[in-house]
Amino acid sequence: MTQKTILNDTHRALGAKMVDFGGWDMPIHYGSQIDEHHQVRRDAGMFDVSHMTVVDLHGVRVREFLRYLLANSVDKLKVSGKALYTCMLNPQGGVIDDLIVYFMQEEFFRLVVNAATRDKDLQWIGEQAARFEVRVKERADFAMIAVQGPNARSKVIDLLDPADASAASKLGRFAALQTRTRDGVALFLARTGYTGEDGFEIVLPQADAVAFWNALLAHGVAPAGLGARDTLRLEAGMNLYGQDMDDNVTPYEAALAWTITLDEGRDFIGRSVLESQKAQGAPRQMIGVVMDEKGVLRHGQKVLSAGGEGEILSGTFSPTLGKAIAFARVPAGSIDDLRVDIRGKQVPLRAVKFPFVRDGQAQPGVLGA
């Protein structure tokens, strides 16, 4: 049965076009995906991300457990509220999921994992947690709203209890704090996001979500759907689980080397495979590509390179750039002479560094000569 977030009726009242996303009935747009994309790049937009799964971990050995479970090192998390982006791997080094882990207290960490991988993640985390005597608690009582864009933070801070406004305005990137609204609603406010823009991802009780959403709306934050969320995150060079990596792809093959910490003396699941790939090189690489000819790049299209065949992963038309952009996975080595097969026609591609867009502007080289 399709699941609904607490904001489902609110989306429908706003005229949202609803689609099935990983078993959830979610808004793809509220009239114009392109307008919503530009709204986030230029001002502020908000997304219902209540389909994401919040998992609280409690126990004396919870840090030790996460040192074993995750490819990035939670030893970097020393201050309450600090967050870390990481992959959770299987023994073959494949990505079970990518997630954010928050350090709350020494015996309490919080994970935010993807919606489509919820069942798999909870089973895997539960299996691994047992021998560390860590309690795993899914927080189905929470909703989550992401407010993103250059004016997002100031619009959210205006709605907070004035006593908390200063701390919220000083909150660093990839950090979170417990705060409350002017009406006394408890918020877990994280300076994170999936758009390449500044902003907050806000976890709050489901019972308060509709009123908070409406308060944001009244304060000039426009609703945005999953369509804009996808084009924004791809412009920002951010991976989507299931398209850009999965259980059969290692972080080195998904341009996620920066999320791996091969620190001394820490044995984590999948480490031996990663050490081998680091020493010998991964057989495949993920690159950013731009198509200067008209058309759209789509997941699964065949890519030809000097090193052999690959495929398009995430692909879209970039509203900011006015061109088709994508991630592609191709054999390691040369990325010269790139072409994509579109209905039997070979169309040239340019390999570029990503993010494609930063601070609302094309990155150097992305638009070509």
UniProtKB/Swiss-Prot annotation:
<dbReference type="InterPro" id="IPR029043">
    <property type="entry name" value="GcvT/YgfZ_C"/>
</dbReference>
<dbReference type="InterPro" id="IPR006222">
    <property type="entry name" value="GCV_T_N"/>
</dbReference>
<comment type="function">
    <text>The glycine cleavage system catalyzes the degradation of glycine.</text>
</comment>
<dbReference type="Pfam" id="PF01571">
    <property type="entry name" value="GCV_T"/>
</dbReference>
<comment type="similarity">
    <text>Belongs to the GcvT family.</text>
</comment>
<dbReference type="GO" id="GO:0019464">
    <property type="term" value="P:glycine decarboxylation via glycine cleavage system"/>
</dbReference>
<dbReference type="Pfam" id="PF08669">
    <property type="entry name" value="GCV_T_C"/>
</dbReference>
<dbReference type="InterPro" id="IPR013977">
    <property type="entry name" value="GCST_C"/>
</dbReference>
<dbReference type="InterPro" id="IPR028896">
    <property type="entry name" value="GcvT/YgfZ/DmdA"/>
</dbReference>
<protein>
    <recommendedName>
        <fullName>Aminomethyltransferase</fullName>
        <ecNumber>2.1.2.10</ecNumber>
    </recommendedName>
</protein>
<dbReference type="GO" id="GO:0004047">
    <property type="term" value="F:aminomethyltransferase activity"/>
</dbReference>
<comment type="subunit">
    <text>The glycine cleavage system is composed of four proteins: P, T, L and H.</text>
</comment>
<dbReference type="GO" id="GO:0005829">
    <property type="term" value="C:cytosol"/>
</dbReference>
<dbReference type="InterPro" id="IPR006223">
    <property type="entry name" value="GCS_T"/>
</dbReference>
<dbReference type="GO" id="GO:0008483">
    <property type="term" value="F:transaminase activity"/>
</dbReference>
<dbReference type="GO" id="GO:0005960">
    <property type="term" value="C:glycine cleavage complex"/>
</dbReference>
<keyword id="KW-0808">Transferase</keyword>
<dbReference type="InterPro" id="IPR022903">
    <property type="entry name" value="GCS_T_bac"/>
</dbReference>
<keyword id="KW-0032">Aminotransferase</keyword>
<dbReference type="InterPro" id="IPR027266">
    <property type="entry name" value="TrmE/GcvT_dom1"/>
</dbReference>
